[in-house]
Amino acid sequence: QPRRKLCILHRNPGRCYDKIPAFYYNQKKKQCERFDWSGCGGNSNRFKTIEECRRTCIG
């Protein structure tokens, strides 16, 4: 079980057109993974670095 509720949210790239490197916690694989964020929208399961993702969702 992830440490925080935001970590169970599905990856959501948002609704704009940029491709900004970001990371999210993949609950099925129990690890943080890279994805492209569009620059707007999405949800809180989005981190600037893999370290921040791991610190928040894994511990």
From Swiss-Prot:
Tagged with keyword DNA damage: no
Name one cellular component (GO) term: extracellular space
**Domain of life of the organism encoding this protein:** Eukaryota
Pyrrolidone carboxylic acid PTM positions read: 1
* Site note May be the major determinant of the binding affinity for potassium channels, residues: 5
Q: Where is this site: Important for binding to potassium channels?
A: 9
Q: Name one GO molecular function term.
A: serine-type endopeptidase inhibitor activity
According to UniProt, the tissues expressing it are described as:
Expressed by the venom gland.
By its UniProt entry, which SMART domains does this protein fall under? KU
Q: Does the keyword Ribosomal protein apply?
A: no
Q: Which residues form the signal peptide?
A: none
Swiss-Prot/TrEMBL site (Not important for inhibition of potassium channels) positions: 19
**Cystines in this chain:** 7-57, 16-40, 32-53
Q: What does the UniProt keyword field contain?
A: Disulfide bond, Ion channel impairing toxin, Neurotoxin, Potassium channel impairing toxin, Pyrrolidone carboxylic acid, Secreted, Toxin, Voltage-gated potassium channel impairing toxin
Q: Tell me the compartments it is located in.
A: Secreted
Q: Which InterPro entries match?
A: Kunitz_BPTI, Kunitz_BPTI_sf, Prtase_inh_Kunz-CS, TFPI/VKTCI-like
* PANTHER family linked: BPTI_KUNITZ INHIBITOR DOMAIN-CONTAINING PROTEIN, KUNITZ-TYPE PROTEASE INHIBITOR-RELATED
Q: What family is it from?
A: Belongs to the venom Kunitz-type family.
Misc: Negative results: does not inhibit serine proteases and voltage-gated potassium channels Kvl.3/KCNA3, Kv1.4/KCNA4, Kv1.5/KCNA5, Kv3.1/KCNC1, Kv3.4/KCNC4, and Kv4.1/KCND1.
Q: Give the protein's function.
A: Serine protease inhibitor homolog that blocks voltage-gated potassium channels (Kv1.1/KCNA1, Kv1.2/KCNA2, and Kv1.6/KCNA6) (IC(50)=0.4-150 nM) and facilitates neurotransmitter release.
- Protein name, per record: Kunitz-type serine protease inhibitor homolog alpha-dendrotoxin
Species lineage? Eukaryota, Metazoa, Chordata, Craniata, Vertebrata
